C-alpha cells in the first residue's frame, strides 16, 4: 500500500506536525507547531550514521531496526498514535522526507492510523519558508513608527495584515525587551515569520525595527524592504506612554515571571533582569545619570513589594525623556522619508486599516 505525501508548502498552513528527527536536529530549528517525537534518539541516530558511513544504507537500516525494536518501538508508535488521535490532520516529516518519515508512516499504518508525510522533509519546507520571505519582501509594506510607549505593537496586532516581529522574536527590541522565557533560534524565528507572511499575500504592516531584535536578525531582504517602506508615526502624550511602558515592562513582566517561576524566584529574576538592563545602557546614560536612575529603580523595587508598581514611573520617565526619546528623534532626523500620516494611536490605526483595505487584490 502506498504511503500518502504532501507538498512542502503544507508547512505554511499551520497543521499539527510530528517531527521524527532526533532531538539534536530539532533543537537546531523546527517548524511552528511541530512536536518532536523522534524515530531515534541522539545516540541511536549517531550509531546508525556511523554504520551508514562504514557499511552503507542496508547495514544502517538493519542496525536501526535492532536498536528501535520491541518495547522501545511500541512506546514510540504509541506516542505518535496518541498525537494523531488528538490531531487527526497531523503531518509527519524528517530531514529530507525520506526513510525516517516513511518508517514512521508504515509503523503507524500497521497500528491502524494513516498520516501523510511532507515530501522533501524539513529541508524542502525550509526552502519554502525562505521563498515566502523573499516574496513578502516584494509586496507592499507599511511601517508603524513612534516613540517608546506609543503601543505600536498593539496597533500591529490589531490588524489582519499585521506581522508582529517582536512577538515572533519573543523580544521587545531594546535593552529592556528580553522575554522571561527562552526566545527562539534564528531558524525558528524565520520559520514563524515565513508562516505569518504566507497569510499576508497582498502586503503587511510591521513595527519599525532595527535589523536585530534581541539576538535575532530580520531576514535581510525583508528588512531592506522595511527600511524603504512608507511610514506612519504614532504620537501620544508622555503620561499615556509612561502608563503603557509600565504595563508592558513592569506589570506584564512581573506576571509572567510569577506565573512561570513562583513568587520568590520570579521576583528575584525580574529584579535581576531590570537591573541588568539598566547596566547595559550605563555608558550611554553617563555615570551620574545612571547612578540616579539606579537609586530610583531600587526605591521602586521596594514600593513594588508593597503593591505599588506605579513607583517604577519615577525611573522610567527620565529613562524615556533623557535616553530613548532623544535617540529616536535623532534617528528620525537622519531618515530621508516623510511619514504618510502622523497622529494619535486611534488615527494611525484607522489609517493602517484604510491602507490595507486599498491593497491590490
Curated annotation (Swiss-Prot):
The active site is at residue 94. InterPro entries: Rhodanese-like_dom, Rhodanese-like_dom_sf, SelU. Residues 11-134 form the Rhodanese domain. Signal peptide: none annotated. Its EC number is 2.9.1.3. It is an enzyme of class 2 (transferase). The keyword Ubl conjugation does not apply. Monomer. Involved in the post-transcriptional modification of the uridine at the wobble position (U34) of tRNA(Lys), tRNA(Glu) and tRNA(Gln). Catalyzes the conversion of 2-thiouridine (S2U-RNA) to 2-selenouridine (Se2U-RNA). Acts in a two-step process involving geranylation of 2-thiouridine (S2U) to S-geranyl-2-thiouridine (geS2U) and subsequent selenation of the latter derivative to 2-selenouridine (Se2U) in the tRNA chain. Belongs to the SelU family. This is tRNA 2-selenouridine synthase. The lineage of its organism: Bacteria, Pseudomonadati, Pseudomonadota, Gammaproteobacteria, Oceanospirillales.
Amino acid at each position: 500500500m502506498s504511503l500518502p505525501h504532501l507538498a512542502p508548502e503544507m508547512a505554511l498552513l499551520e497543521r499539527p506536525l510530528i517531527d521524527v528527527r532526533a532531538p539534536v536536529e530539532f533543537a537546531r530549528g523546527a517548524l511552528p507547531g511541530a512536536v518532536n517525537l523522534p524515530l531515534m534518539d541522539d545516540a541511536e541516530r549517531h550509531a546508525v550514521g556511523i554504520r551508514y558511513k562504514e557499511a552503507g544504507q542496508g547495514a544502517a537500516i538493519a542496525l536501526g531496526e535492532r536498536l528501535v525494536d520491541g518495547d522501545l518501538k511500541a512506546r514510540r508508535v504509541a506516542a505518535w498514535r496518541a498525537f494523531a488521535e488528538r490531531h487527526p490532520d497531523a503531518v509527519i516529516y524528517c530531514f529530507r522526507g525520506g526513510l525516517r518519515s516513511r518508517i514512521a508512516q508504515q509503523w503507524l499504518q500497521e497500528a491502524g492510523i494513516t498520516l501523510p508525510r511532507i515530501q522533501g522533509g524539513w529541508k524542502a519546507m525550509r526552502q519554502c519558508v525562505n521563498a515566502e520571505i523573499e516574496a513578502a519582501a516584494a509586496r507592499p509594506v507599511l511601517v508603524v513608527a513612534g516613540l517608546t510607549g506609543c503601543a505600536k505593537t498593539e496597533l500591529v496586532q490589531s490588524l489582519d495584515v499585521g506581522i508582529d516581529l517582536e512577538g515572533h522574536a519573543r523580544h521587545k527590541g531594546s535593552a529592556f525587551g528580553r522575554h522571561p522565557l527562552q526566545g527562539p533560534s534564528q531558524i525558528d524565528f524565520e520559520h514563524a515569520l515565513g508562516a505569518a507572511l504566507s497569510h499576508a499575500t497582498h502586503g503587511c504592516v510591521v513595527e519599525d525595527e532595527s535589523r536585530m531584535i534581541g539576538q535575532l536578525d530580520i531576514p535581510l531582504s525583508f528588512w531592506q524592504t522595511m527600511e524603504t517602506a512608507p511610514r506612519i508615526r504614532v504620537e501620544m502624550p508622555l503620561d499615556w506612554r509612561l502608563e503603557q511602558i509600565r504595563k508592558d515592562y513592569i506589570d506584564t513582566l512581573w506576571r509572567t515571571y510569577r506565573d512561570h517561576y513562583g513568587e520568590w524566584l520570579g521576583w528575584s529574576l525580574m529584579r535581576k533582569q531590570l537591573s541588568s538592563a539598566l547596566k547595559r545602557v550605563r555608558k550611554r546614560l553617563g555615570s551620574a545619570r545612571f547612578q540616579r536612575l539606579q537609586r530610583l529603580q531600587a526605591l521602586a523595587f521596594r514600593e513594588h513589594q508593597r503593591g505599588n508598581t506605579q513607583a517604577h514611573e519615577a525611573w522610567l520617565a527620565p529613562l524615556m525623556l533623557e535616553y530613548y526619546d532623544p535617540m529616536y528623534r535623532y534617528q528620525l532626523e537622519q531618515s530621508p522619508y516623510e511619514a504618510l500620516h502622523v497622529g494619535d494611536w486611534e488615527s494611525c490605526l484607522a489609517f493602517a486599516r484604510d491602507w490595507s483595505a486599498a491593497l491590490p487584490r
